[in-house]
Design a protein with these regions (language model features):
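Histidine-centered divalent metal-coordination motifs
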Residues: 15-19, 69-70, 130, 156-166
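Short, conserved loop/helix-junction motifs that constitute active-site signature segments
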Residues: 25-27, 55-60, 84-87, 120-122, ...
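Core catalytic region of metal-dependent phosphoesterases/phosphodiesterases
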Residues: 7, 13-101
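Short acidic-hydrophobic surface loop/beta-edge motif
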Residues: 1-4, 95-103, 169-173
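Conserved beta-sheet core of the metallophosphoesterase superfamily
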Residues: 61-64, 134-182
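Binuclear metal-dependent hydrolase catalytic cores centered on His/Asp/Glu-rich metal-binding motifs
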Residues: 89, 102-149
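Active-site-proximal beta-strand elements of phosphoester/diester hydrolases
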Residues: 7-17, 103-112, 126-130, 177-182
Length: 182
């Protein structure tokens, strides 16, 4: 999905489950974001290698990756290897972190993260998570931690995936436009 904010073009997607090469990424993209589930339960195999090679091939100035629930390697203690492989290809992994893309402040928190309030500033332009906030386009599978963070910080945009049935749907929640980017 193409989004424009602060004179930057952002292409954001999630939940390709190994079918990333089917996406048509616009050439004029400043910020490229994947909100997880790029692979289908693969542990540091060819599927990761192919995704990293594909994702890094775009001329976007910033490439950001937020792990999803299908990135089992992150959950099983392999995140350092993947982050290193991505970093070497110019991809920034955002996991309970913030990144400044030339004045566009983008942050990410985990669905069950209680450290969000401690580490993530509330003046974000964009929040990117894999899971939706509880009660918003979530099929009752959203995160209360994410909901609480969105209520507190009210970023301009909240981009998330995970819920395939809500693909492309938008919901205005206070000052925050929530968009399912599956």
């Amino acid at each position: 999905m193409m989004i424009h904010i602060n004179n930057h073009s952002i292409f954001a997607f999630s939940d390709t489950h190994g079918r990333h090469r089917d996406l048509r990424v616009p050439e004029k993209t400043d910020i490229l974001i994947c909100a997880g589930d790029a692979v289908e339960d693969n542990l540091l195999g060819d599927e990761y290698d192919d995704f990293i090679e594909w994702f890094s091939s775009f001329p976007a100035k910033w490439k950001l990756f937020v792990p999803g629930n299908h990135e089992l390697s992150f959950e099983l203690g392999q995140s350092e290897k993947i982050e290193k492989a991505m970093s070497e290809k110019g991809i920034q992994v955002l996991q309970n972190a913030v990144y400044d893309c030339d004045g566009v402040i983008i942050g990410s928190i985990d669905a069950d993260s209680s450290i969000a309030d401690e580490n993530i500033p509330t003046d974000l332009d964009i929040l990117v998570t894999h899971y939706p906030p509880y009660g918003i386009l979530d099929d009752d599978m959203g995160s209360t931690e994410i909901l609480n963070f969105v209520m507190k910080s009210q970023p301009s945009l909240h981009l998330f995936g995970h819920i395939h049935s809500a693909k492309g749907q938008k919901y205005q929640f206070g000052k925050t436009l929530c968009i399912n980017i599956v």
